[in-house]
């Protein structure tokens, strides 16, 4: 049975989730997180995506993204996923898949759901009991979005003025 096509609309934010195969760690060292974020930034720009929020957990990734073209998030995720898997497999002398199938996607059309989704993403490390406050977690957009600190992915925030 063929898989259902994704519903992604131009300029409508989408919540993307990519999990490690069998929930295995996808990030082992700080360098892994750093490389992933650098490549996320690079491929987001290339595809024309705006990354509004993100969190890199040990075994999965959440992104809140929008783009002017419906194909752009898929292009970004394909390029990013391939490059990161090659890096990870080479670095840790392994082979095979890193990710658990296709990434999942969910449209976030309503503004109240959009803000709830951003909070959900940025509070993930707190819910996982990794930190007490989201600002303590290095691998999320919380500090950039909530506190104006650090480096936004590409200058677009969901924060209300």
Feature map (PLM): residue ranges:
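Short Pro-Cys-Gly-centered "Cys-loop" motif that presents a nucleophilic cysteine in a tight turn
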Residues: 1-53, 57-58, 66-161
């Amino acid at each position: 049975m063929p898989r259902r096509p994704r519903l992604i609309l131009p300029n409508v934010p989408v919540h993307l989730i990519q999990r490690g195969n069998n929930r295995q760690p996808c990030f082992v060292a700080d360098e892994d997180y750093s490389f992933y974020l650098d490549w996320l930034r690079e491929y987001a720009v290339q595809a024309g995506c705006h990354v509004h929020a993100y969190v890199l957990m040990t075994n999965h990734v959440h992104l809140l993204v929008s783009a002017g073209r419906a194909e752009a998030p898929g292009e970004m995720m394909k390029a990013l996923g391939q490059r990161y898997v090659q890096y990870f497999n080479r670095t840790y002398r392994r082979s095979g898949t890193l990710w658990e199938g296709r990434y999942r996607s969910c449209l976030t059309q309503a503004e109240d759901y959009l803000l709830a989704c951003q909070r959900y993403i940025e509070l993930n490390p707190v819910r996982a009991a990794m930190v007490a406050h989201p600002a303590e977690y290095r691998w999320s957009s919380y500090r950039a979005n909530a506190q104006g600190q650090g480096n936004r992915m590409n200058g677009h925030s969901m924060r209300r003025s």
